[in-house]
Amino acid sequence: AEAEAVKFHELSPVRAVPFCQHYGVCGGCKWQVLPYSEQIKYKQKQVEDNLKRIGKIELPEISPILGSAKTEFYRNKLEYTFSNKRWLTNDEVRQDVKYDQMNAVGFHIPGAFDKVLAIEKCWLQDDISNRIRNAVRDYAYEHDYSFINLRSQEGMLRNMIIRTSSTGEL
């Protein structure tokens, strides 16, 4: 079952506005509606609950999570998937437009191994990753490379891993 919030009667005073255009569809940044300081509190509680209540593990007091100085562009590796079955967002479906380009380079939709959300900008890895991914995508379009059909396993392009270092090397 799926649901979509259509109206909020009152927003939490700690709610944040998600900065990613793909928020709510991608699944990569599920916590963006909370400020980072609040995310850490809830993640701490989740870890403790998983260990104590679910795992039945008696623990001494757990030290607080040490937050990162970076809340954007902090990952050093991302794996993108190519697919010939691009996921259409609810907004795209509502527009009732026929899309000529159904290929995508991006991330799997949560719960759908064969559907990939086309990512234009990802805030998880340094911006050079976005430029590389989009350049490879454009090159593949221009040269008519086939994107994989994840069900039949036919197609040339399947995955792309981009790894960066703190020095900016690729």
What are these model-derived regions, one by one?
Residues 1-170:
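Accessory RNA-recognition modules of RNA-modification enzymes
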